[in-house]
């Protein structure tokens, strides 16, 4: 009998779904990687000032939506590029139904410039619950995934080369003389740095002049008081890096649900904390996210509040 943390009340096997979504994300990633080899910036469209979309975003989304419809035919969609016409309601589905939240290429600007990281992000939600989160980083071939109550993991698939598994450190489970087709990958856990040593990621939104004064105040507040500050250009990957202990904290405002939904679950299942900019635990319908290792969360929130107060003087 399977443990409770692998199922929801309606019988969904979340672990199985997570691994199936990993395969779908990898398939989309392979398409993106292939298209990048012959990509031309002349094929890029502007959605807003400094916010871009390409035929690769749309092609990846179509591939993902088609595969997810086969996996859970009754589920709805929230997609960045809106290719799931007829199902894409642009908001959370009702409390009973499941909804896929898809970013087919998070970090499009990075992709355009051939600058890592960029990723595929897929989440399954129901009401106020994030059930499954999968983020596949294409350049490093890393798949981060989690399911509610089951933990967060990295690379739960064997990597074959010349008929042999590249995972030579004993992590791979063998079955009938070969690699077992699926298994839980490396468990993820957030880091333990305090604010003085923290590696902090502060993303800048593309299209919001209102946020410019805030980010200036934030950098002024934290610069010299944390280990270092970074900007990586992908919300999904910033969240995964927090989950893996590569970053200690990440904050961004004016972003879409598809940007953060999968990564947020991965952080929480890795032992981290996620809120919105107001410190509220229910962040799923908002446009801001703050994710940390937990240790530095209050310090980061104080910095956000200090920045706001400075602008009100």
Feature locations, PLM:
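An extended, acidic
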Residues: 188-313
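Short helix-loop capping/hinge motifs at secondary-structure junctions, enriched
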Residues: 152-154, 181-183, 209, 296-299
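N-terminal subdomain of lithium-sensitive/metallo-dependent phosphomonoesterases centered on the IMPase/IPPase/PAP
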Residues: 1-105, 310-313
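DPxDG-like acidic metal-binding loop motif
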Residues: 90, 94-153
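Arg/Gly-rich low-complexity intrinsically disordered repeat tracts
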Residues: 3, 9, 157-178
């Amino acid at each position: 009998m399977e443990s409770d943390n692998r199922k929801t009340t309606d019988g969904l096997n979340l672990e199985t779904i997570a691994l199936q979504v990993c395969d779908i994300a990898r398939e989309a990633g392979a398409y993106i990687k292939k298209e990048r080899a012959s990509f031309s910036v002349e094929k890029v469209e502007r959605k807003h000032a400094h916010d871009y979309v390409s035929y690769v975003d749309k092609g990846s989304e179509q591939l993902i939506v088609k595969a997810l419809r086969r996996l859970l035919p009754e589920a709805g969609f929230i997609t960045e590029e809106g290719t799931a016409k007829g199902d894409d309601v642009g908001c959370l589905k009702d409390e009973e139904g499941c909804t896929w939240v898809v970013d087919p290429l998070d970090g499009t600007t990075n992709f355009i410039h051939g600058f890592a990281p960029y990723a595929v992000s897929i989440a399954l939600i129901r009401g106020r619950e994030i059930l499954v989160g999968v983020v596949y980083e294409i350049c490093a071939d890393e798949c981060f995934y989690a399911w509610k109550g089951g933990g967060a993991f990295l690379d739960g698939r064997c990597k074959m080369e010349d008929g042999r598994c590249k995972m030579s450190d004993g992590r791979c489970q063998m079955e009938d003389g070969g690699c077992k087709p699926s298994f839980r990958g490396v468990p993820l856990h957030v880091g333990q740095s305090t604010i003085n040593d923290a590696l902090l990621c502060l993303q800048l939104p593309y299209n919001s002049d209102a946020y410019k004064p805030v980010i200036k105040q934030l950098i002024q507040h934290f610069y010299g008081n944390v280990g270092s500050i970074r900007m990586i250009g992908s919300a999904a990957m910033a969240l995964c890096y927090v989950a893996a202990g590569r970053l200690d904290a990440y904050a961004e405002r004016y972003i879409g649900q598809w940007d953060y939904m999968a990564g947020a679950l991965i952080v929480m299942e890795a032992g981290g904390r996620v809120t919105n900019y107001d410190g509220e635990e229910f962040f799923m319908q908002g446009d801001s996210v703050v994710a940390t290792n937990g240790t530095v969360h209050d310090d980061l929130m104080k910095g956000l509040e200090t920045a706001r107060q400075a602008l009100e003087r």
